[in-house]
Amino acid sequence: MLRSRLIRSSRLFSTSSQVRADFTHIVIGAGAVGLAIGAEISKDPNHSVLVIEKNEEHGQETSSRNSEVIHAGLYYPVDSLKTELCILGKQLIYNECEAMGVEMKRCGKWIVAQNELQLEYLKKIHEKSKQLQVETSFVPSNKAKELEPSIRADYAVLNSPTTGIVSAHSLMNYQLSVLQNNDGQLAVGSEVVGLTYSEGMKEYEVDVSSEDGENMSISGNVLINCAGLYAPQVSNMLLPEERHLKAYYAKGNYFSFQGNPGIRRLIYPCPTPGVASLGTHLTLDLGGQMKFGPDLEWVDELTEDVYKVNDQNLIPAYNEVRKYFPSVQLENLSGSYSGIRPKLIGEDVKEFQDFVIRKEDGYPGFINCMGIESPGLTASMGIAKYVSNLL
């Protein structure tokens, strides 16, 4: 387990109620985005960087409980941060991380249409991809049947060759190595319990508590909130009540598939307009094992058993998968794992919600990164560049 020097040294102060350490930059949250930001800003030798993580290891929540897809950047409004930073992040992953040994594969993706309405949707995505200069192409039906005989696509197949898969842990471990090679630190098992801003000192004080009851007060000139599911909660510790945000949680269950029909690429159904997910899709891991998900299940709170797969969702997922993979058998599917999407809007709100990455008025040096759901893993290095430019 990777632990920072801060955590190890703080345990030496067993008789003291507080330990104080100063950094130029403090990042809250050691998921894919927090580690990427920590790595990026640590490249400046004038920066002393600390990344704080409440769990005992980095990347234990949304960053590792997802489809592990390198997204092309096709689905979101052209002028959105999701589109801009997904495309940039994809390029950085392929250009930088692949050369450094991060485990990944450029397997490509098909989006399949089963009716006229879905065909029109694919045409719009294809036109948008031209505007974004992201490669897509329609696959002739005879060629599609030759390449993937198990897949049903009654009306059309849109190919996205720049889509891939990546080991989230391999990617995060690479970012952590960059951070630590630049003398940055990761503090695990350290939950943020309070935030204050000193106008006179022009610095932030971060109150941190460990599982064994040890407390620390850490100061930093710049504070970056990348707490994922808990980002609104962290932001609300600092901002006045009228600027508080509510967190919403959209659970996604994944189901593993027993067998190997030889499918070689990711298969996505056409998304349903106004629904907060891309549909129950077919993804592959780096070993070629198939899985299906995520579905969409709204949960009210993050309970201890929130990550337990909801087996009641197996048959609905099976029915969705059958639409594009008709030979799938129910007995070949079983619950695998689940993840939680950090949402800033609830189930009843249908409009698009972009990433929220911004400076906060009245709090110089404080940057919020909230609502970082899909394509957050792909966009993580793009987000890091964006945040670095905000500083």
Model features per residue range: what roles?
Residues 308, 312-391:
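C-terminal catalytic lobe of FAD-dependent flavoproteins
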Residues 158-221, 381:
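Helical element adjacent to the flavin cofactor pocket in flavoenzyme catalytic cores
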Residues 42-65:
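Glycine-rich FAD pyrophosphate-binding loop
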Residues 36, 195-293, 297-308, 319:
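Flavin-dependent oxidoreductases
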Residues 19-33, 50:
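Beta1/beta-strand and adjacent pyrophosphate-binding region of the FAD-binding site
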Residues 68-143, 147, 154, 280:
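Dinucleotide-binding Rossmann-like beta1-alpha1 core, especially the glycine-rich loop
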